[in-house]
Every structure is written in C-alpha cells, then in structure tokens.
Curated annotation (Swiss-Prot):
EC number of the protein: 2.1.1.182
SUPFAM superfamilies in the cross-refs: S-adenosyl-L-methionine-dependent methyltransferases
PROSITE patterns, per database record: RRNA_A_DIMETH, SAM_RNA_A_N6_MT
EC category name: transferase
Gene designation: rsmA
An example Gene Ontology CC term for this record: cytosol
Keyword line: Cytoplasm, Methyltransferase, RNA-binding, rRNA processing, S-adenosyl-L-methionine, Transferase
Organism (species): Phenylobacterium zucineum (strain HLK1)
Name this protein carries in UniProt: Ribosomal RNA small subunit methyltransferase A
One Pfam family named in its UniProt record: RrnaAD
GO MF: 16S rRNA (adenine(1518)-N(6)/adenine(1519)-N(6))-dimethyltransferase activity; RNA binding
Entry keyword annotation includes Cytoplasm: yes
PANTHER family reported in the protein's UniProt record: DIMETHYLADENOSINE TRANSFERASE, DIMETHYLADENOSINE TRANSFERASE-RELATED
Principal location: cytoplasm
Family: Belongs to the class I-like SAM-binding methyltransferase superfamily. rRNA adenine N(6)-methyltransferase family. RsmA subfamily.
C-alpha cells in the first residue's frame, strides 16, 4: 500500500469507529487541500525532519509525507494507533510516538537533528506547548502551528492592540512570528465554535538566555497581571520606579503599550538588581 492508495480520511475514521474527543480538544482537519497548503507554508521538503503533535486521523501527516519530509508524529490518544499504523505502513519515513507532547523530549525524538514543528494543535494544549518550545532547552528549526484565532492573534499582536499581552512578548522575544493563514470553523470535523489560524514562527538566532527568559516571564507576569495600571504600580514588588527608569521606560506607561524590547530591558534591569551586592546599612554611633 502507498499513500495514494490509502482510504480517504473519512473512510479511515469510519472503518476504525473513531470520533473527536472533546476532552482532548480534538477537531479533525479532513480537507487535504488545506493540509497541503499548511505543508507548503511550513517550507519543508525532502529529508527534512518534522515533528507533528496531535496527528489524529493523519490528514496533515499525509500532506507532510508527500513533501518527502521525515515525520515524527506524537499522539496522546491511543485510539488512533491502528489507523496511524496503516499510514506508517504506507510511508516508511513516518515514525509514530504515543505519549504526551508536554513531556516529550524533542531533542531525543529528532536524534539531535534540526527539526521543524508543524501541527494542528489540540486547542487545550496549544499555548503551553508553544511556551515550552520557545523557552525550553531545545530550539526548533521553525514552527508552523494552527491555533484558535484568538490565540494566534495574541501571539502576533503589536503593542497597543487589544490582543497584545504576555504571550506576544514571549513569542516575539524568542522568534519572528507572523500569521500566514486563516482556517474557517467549517473546515473541521466537528466544527469548533471558533475560527482558527496558522502562525509561522522562526526562532531568533540570538535567543535570550534561560536566565533572561526567566526574568522576562517574571516581569511580564507582573506587568500584565495588572495591565491597566501604570508600570510604577504593577511592578512595585519587583523594584518599582528605580527598576523602570533603569530600563529606560516611563513609570507612567501601561504594559499594553510597552514594546518587546522594553520588556527585555526590564528583564535585564531586574537581573542586574538581583545580582548587585546589597549595600550595608550605616552603623549607628
């Protein structure tokens, strides 16, 4: 059997008695025209290593295999093992891994080779997976990922936009992020109640150090935890006005208008304050 002679996705689902599980945030993308477009947007080809999370019935998997890429598909739902094994039998360059992507070791999966992440992510784990990939020790070659439209907007938002927040800062501090494709709800089975979008992220060559990323997460959590307040109030516990002025920012500004570079400067200022030796208090006479 080859990819061309496999049953259609709907036929495969029916043959195995499979359906989407709400608990796993599953919505199946069965239109091969759309999955092939996503594979093109991923810019992968012959011999490239691709990690796909949540392949489900394998629609995007098939499209990626058609490019000649070597696909490592990570699936949590054991129900799909027989169906995906049929795809693997037809495509020797597909490797199946059953387990939780949140705890997966991508460096081990890819055997140390550069790997691209291409996935129609389950809605309920998309954001934590993205944070893991952008801030963890392993750096992907690129990420082409589908999210709920609202999450995609939060990843790519600019300062001053309603969707701009902590996720945008972390994503854009570590990667060049841009929306590349909208996908209507009707394209999925079952149709979700929201629209979806594909985001393309290319990790920056000079990614912030782990210490700088930890500091960035700390200052963004404080700043956006009270996003309507001035920085002098929201960052009071981290150093207040001295911290903010050390970063070259206006203490009266609000988090929603501070650019990514400003938050990186805040992270640097917080690290500098933390590492500075404490000044001894003068002794009384």
């Amino acid at each position: 059997m080859s990819l061309e002679t496999l049953p259609t996705l709907r036929e495969a689902l029916e043959a195995h008695g499979l359906w989407a599980k709400k608990a796993f945030g599953q919505h199946f993308l069965l239109d091969l025209n759309i999955t092939r477009k996503i594979a093109r947007l991923a810019q992968v080809g012959d011999g490239d290593v691709v990690i796909e999370v949540g392949p489900g019935p394998g629609g995007l998997t098939r499209a990626l295999l058609e490019t000649g890429a070597r696909v490592i598909a990570v699936e949590k739902d054991e129900r799909f093992r027989p169906l995906l094994q049929e795809v693997a039998d037809a495509a020797p360059h597909l490797t199946l891994v059953f387990g939780d992507a949140l705890t997966a070791d991508e460096a081990a999966l890819s055997a140390g080779r550069p790997a691209h992440l291409v996935s129609n992510l389950p809605y309920n784990v998309g954001t934590p997976l993205l944070i893991k990939w952008l801030t963890g020790p392993w750096t992907p070659a690129s990420l082409t990922l589908m999210f709920q439209k609202e999450v995609a907007d939060r990843i790519t938002a600019a300062p001053g936009e309603d969707a701009y927040g902590r996720l945008a800062v972390i994503a854009q501090a570590t990667a060049d992020a841009r929306p590349v494709m909208d996908v209507p709800a009707r394209a999925f089975t079952p149709p979700p109640k929201v629209e979806s979008a594909v985001v393309r992220l290319e990790p920056r060559a000079a990614r912030p150090s782990p210490e700088r990323l930890d500091a960035l997460q700390k200052v963004t959590a404080a700043a956006f935890g009270q996003r309507r307040k001035m920085l002098r109030s929201s960052l009071k516990a981290l150093g207040g006005e001295p911290l903010i002025t050390a970063a070259g920012l206006d203490p009266a500004a609000r988090a929603e208008v501070v650019p990514v570079a400003g938050f990186l400067a805040l992270a640097d200022a917080w690290l500098a304050r933390r590492e500075a030796p404490a000044t001894a208090a003068p002794r009384g006479r």
